[in-house]
Structure formats: C-alpha cells, structure tokens
Amino acid sequence: SSLTSLNLYQNFIGQEGAIAIADTLKVNSSLTSLNLGRNSIQKGGAVAIADALKGNTSLISLNLEGNSMHEDEAIAIAGALKVNLTIKSLDLSKNALNKEGAFAIADALKVNSSLVSLSLNENFIEQEGAVAIADALKVNTSLISLNFSHNDIGLHGSASIAKSLAYNPSLIHLEINQIRRPMLTGLQEFKDTFGNLKDLLNVLIGEDGAQVLGGAFCIKSRCVVVLN
C-alpha cells in the first residue's frame, strides 16, 4: 500500500475498529501518520494499538487524544515507547492517564530516544506525576516539545519541571499553565534554568507573574510568554 496518512478523527470506530487498525499496523510499512483522536477506542483498542507499535517501523505521528484512556492504557503505550524507534510525535491529551499513567510514561521517556513531541495536557497528572516527568526530562535528550498544561501540578510539580530544564539540552517548547501568584516566589529562583526554551506557552501568571518571570523567556529579543 502507498497510503501514508490516515485521519479517522471522531469517527466513532470504537474498540473493534481500533483493534482492526492495530492488526493492519502490524503488517503495514507505509503509513507514517495516524489520527485516532476521539474515537472511544477503550482499553482493548488502546492496548492493541500499543502492541502493534512494538513491531511497527513506519509510523511517525500518532494521535490518541480524547479516548478516555486511563493508567492501564498509559502503561501499555509506555511499554511500546520503550522499544519503538520511529514514533516522533505522540498526542495523549484529554484523557485520564492520572499520576500512575505519568509514572509509566516517565519511565519510557528515560529510555526512548526517538520521540520529539509529546502532548499530555488535561490528564489529571497532578504534582506527583509532574515530578516523575521532570525526573525523566533530566535524562531524555530527544524531546523538543512538551504540552503539560491543565494538569494541576502545583508548586512542587512546577518547580520540579523548572529544575529539570537545567539538565535537559533539547526541550525548546513547553506548555504549562495555572501558575498562580503563590507559586511565583517559589519559581523565581529557578527562572535562570529556562534559558534553553524558545517557547513557553499557556502560562496563567498575569501581570505580577510577568514581572517576576517574564524576562526569563525573552530569548534573542523574542518574548514568547502567552498570558491568558
């Protein structure tokens, strides 16, 4: 087959449809982009896709946004990421991976060397999950873009992400938010670690926060903080 891109976004293919797609991925060698966002693929579908990824060598971009996936599905996908060498872009946003799912993804990031873009926004990851991802960022050298917004990561989670950037040489695009005034004092001491970033988006810090942190994100005369 010569098909390289397949977009099934919001087509209600369900678990059975996802399993059928997974079976195809096991033998297909041409598809590079697959969008299965908002399809209610359920646990069986997600696990089947993850299993297929372990042997697939062509897929570069995979979107699994909004499929009501939980920690078990995240664990399965993380297992695939530990052995898959081709996936570069993975969208797991708007699911319910929770902190346990974040733990699994973090473990995968410590050994994965191909993923460059990861979306984990709106996954109820919270503070402990953020700390795990931060630890992974200290050793991961491939990730360039990370969307971590809307996860209620708190001061400790935010500070952990900030501190990890001092060790990470590759990340240049980071989306976080919900950094409120009580967190600003705690984050101020880490603002110098943000120097590698070219983009810091979705930071809900307001005018006070801009005065504290804003200057840290002006790189080569380009200020890219988005204040909502």
Predicted features and spans:
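Leucine-rich tandem repeat or coiled-coil scaffolds
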Residues: S1-N228
